[in-house]
Regions:
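Solvent-exposed soluble domains appended to multi-pass membrane proteins
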Residues: 1-183
Length: 183
């Protein structure tokens, strides 16, 4: 009588076990950094903020990476800068993300349905570019039911400016082919 989510977790656990049993026999295993993450949650398990936007991410290196836990809000765009930072590489890279090892607040920007969302450790701001923005305090309002943009207009406006600037930079970079230069 397992739920779909429980079956999925059990299968993922089994698959990862089999994968690591196999790769740990390879000579390259101890010098490899593994990133285990998801691209989205199960759609039918989306009942509140956490089940909608929270996905796991595990960075595992058998020989190199000590234990580290971050509760910082991050996104997949932070993976490349995090690895570059961890490996102490001096390189130019094309990424809108930031290393999770930096001593700075994390945030994530994404599109969910018709809404653009900027997420911080404390707030979620939504903007569909047509209606008034909405701001939620995610620690106390996990269902995102209580818009507090009128109570905290400065925070709402600051986050909205950050969101719009981010979207503008991404749009310009893609339109001008500035994301990656081969040489």
């Amino acid at each position: 009588n397992e739920s779909e989510l429980e079956r999925s977790v059990r299968y993922s656990d089994f698959s990862l076990k089999k994968f690591f049993e196999y790769v740990q026999t390879k000579s390259w295993f101890k010098n490899t950094i593994f990133i285990i993450t998801a691209d989205h949650t199960l759609y039918n398990s989306r009942t509140n903020f956490k089940t909608t936007f929270h996905i796991p991410c595990l960075i595992y290196s058998p020989e190199n990476l000590g234990a580290f836990k971050s509760n910082k809000t991050t996104s997949h765009m932070d993976l490349v800068p995090t690895l570059i930072d961890y490996l102490h590489l001096q390189t130019t890279h094309s990424s809108m993300g930031k290393s999770i090892f930096l001593d700075s607040d994390g945030f994530a920007v994404f599109k969910f349905g018709a809404e653009y969302i900027i997420l911080t450790d404390q707030y979620c701001l939504t903007n569909d570019l047509e209606n008034p923005i909405k701001l939620y305090e995610i620690r106390s309002d996990k269902d995102l039911k209580h818009d507090i943009s009128k109570k905290l207009p400065d925070i709402a406006e600051d986050l909205n400016k950050k969101l719009l600037a981010y979207l503008q930079i991404v749009t310009y970079s893609v339109a001008q082919d500035k994301i990656y230069t081969a040489n």
